[in-house]
Amino acid sequence: MSPQTETKASVGFKAGVKDYKLTYYTPDYETKDTDILAAFRVTPQPGVPPEEAGAAVRAESSTGTWTTVWTDGLTSLDRYKGRCYHIEPVAGEENQYIAYVAYPLDLFEEGSVTNMFTSIVGNVFGFKALRALRLEGLRIPPAYSKTFQGPPHGIQVERDKLNKYGRPLLGCTIKPKLGLSAKNYGRAVYECLRGGLDFTKDDENVNSQPFMRWRDRFVFCAEAIDKAQAETGEIKGHYLNATAGTCEEMIKRAVFARELGVPIVMHDYLTGGFTANTSLAHYCRDNGLLLHIHRAMHAVIDRQKNHGIHFRVLAKALRMSGGDHIHAGTVVGKLEGERGITLGFVDLLRDDFIEKDRSRGIYFTQDWVSLPGVLPVASGGIHVWHMPALTEIFGDDSVLQFGGGTLGHPWGNAPGAVANRVALEACVQARNEGGDLAREGNEIIREASKWSPELAAACEVWKEIKFEFQAMDTL
């Protein structure tokens, strides 16, 4: 009989209920390099100590249940249990705490974002002892991140495929998002691409509806891409949304896109699910397709600052599951995004190594050990006057996506695309020559518009458009 077995036998089994904190709150624990670390914003119910609330979260997401069970004696709980190792109050908030938790790596299936989230957030958010709970951050150890393929290609490979360097990429979502026939949809794509955009895009809910079946849309968009490439000499693409009701149908659509010779497909990764997304990412790497990711449904999960999952966690999960682009807010447009927080998760998407920085919402140092990076996509309510700020905020490794800011041009889609391309090139040139985009941005756009009637018309249309609301998600 092993010493471990003898110890368990000597303790014996005592039925009943005991406080979680007696087992799962371990303030003396020293985290291991292989642990997955999590930071939870915990709001306990009145009368519930923060140590008990934090330990309850750990128990339910690892080895615990509501009562003592005799099968606890058949394994080593000390090896497999999650541990709440630190709790700190949230400044300026009453009865709210950040609880830090360490999970042993053996609790998780290799290469499965689905299993990771099922374990960490799958059941605990409904606990009665908690008024609210939010997952604010994760530290993914190299030992776990190396079990994931990650993005199909990554930033450098994408630039090499497109032969485009030294500037952000330009995109446009085709509008109206629903109701166009496939041929008219393809015409809109062609006009935008020939005007100077790098990409056009299906919107998130364009799948295969009665007014435009997916196969027809794919064919007409491929024709538009080929024609625009022939006219401009540039490589072009359209994000063909492969999201479908089943994984099999999704892959079938991706296969058809590859057969048409297009460079990129798209997936709604939250509504489609992480298992489907990872499957599509693997197919895209094996078959040379780039993968654009839309985050439809994210605000249901991340909008409330006290409950849910912060988008920085969803962004990390996407980098693991796989995607070459992902929408990341704009800071300046119609969709919410506070600058420091947004740039925090943009770095988590693009960089190899990111230092802990609570001022930007980064709770843990993250080492991706060369997992390919993801291009952040700025999209939502942006137009030519935003171009200097977007270029300064997001830098070259980004996609700036103008939907209404292209298609709403008074002269049509192609002039709208020209206006955006001229504005971008002017901002990049000014920056490269030492200009200050933050201070001189409006003047740079005005000067460029003297030489571009398309840009001048766009400047006139959108000169008064602003989206000035207080961001809900603050540190």
Swiss-Prot record:
Q: List ligand-binding residues for Mg(2+).
A: K201, D203, E204
SUPFAM superfamilies in alphabetical order: RuBisCo, C-terminal domain, RuBisCO, large subunit, small (N-terminal) domain
Q: Which residues form the active site?
A: K175 (proton acceptor), H294 (proton acceptor)
In alphabetical order, the GO MF annotations are:
magnesium ion binding; monooxygenase activity; ribulose-bisphosphate carboxylase activity
Q: What is its main location?
A: plastid
Q: Which residues carry this modification: N6-carboxylysine?
A: K201
* Localization: Plastid, Chloroplast
Entry-linked Gene3D superfamilies: Ribulose bisphosphate carboxylase, large subunit, C-terminal domain (3.20.20.110), RuBisCO large subunit, N-terminal domain (3.30.70.150)
Catalysed reaction equations from the record: 2 (2R)-3-phosphoglycerate + 2 H(+) = D-ribulose 1,5-bisphosphate + CO2 + H2O; D-ribulose 1,5-bisphosphate + O2 = 2-phosphoglycolate + (2R)-3-phosphoglycerate + 2 H(+)
A GO cellular component term found in this entry reads:
chloroplast
Q: Which domain of life is it from?
A: Eukaryota
Provide the propeptide boundaries: 1-2
Please list the GO biological process terms of this entry.
photorespiration; reductive pentose-phosphate cycle
Q: Where is this site: Transition state stabilizer?
A: K334
UniProt EC number: 4.1.1.39
Cofactor, free-text remark: Binds 1 Mg(2+) ion per subunit.
Could you tell me which residues carry N6,N6,N6-trimethyllysine?
K14
Functional description taken from the UniProt entry: RuBisCO catalyzes two reactions: the carboxylation of D-ribulose 1,5-bisphosphate, the primary event in carbon dioxide fixation, as well as the oxidative fragmentation of the pentose substrate in the photorespiration process. Both reactions occur simultaneously and in competition at the same active site.
Q: How does it assemble?
A: Heterohexadecamer of 8 large chains and 8 small chains; disulfide-linked. The disulfide link is formed within the large subunit homodimers.
> Known PANTHER family for this protein?
RIBULOSE BISPHOSPHATE CARBOXYLASE, RIBULOSE BISPHOSPHATE CARBOXYLASE LARGE CHAIN
Give the miscellaneous note.
The basic functional RuBisCO is composed of a large chain homodimer in a 'head-to-tail' conformation. In form I RuBisCO this homodimer is arranged in a barrel-like tetramer with the small subunits forming a tetrameric 'cap' on each end of the 'barrel'.
UniProt-recorded name of the protein: Ribulose bisphosphate carboxylase large chain
- Identify the species of origin: Notothixos subaureus (Golden mistletoe)
Q: Which gene encodes it?
A: rbcL
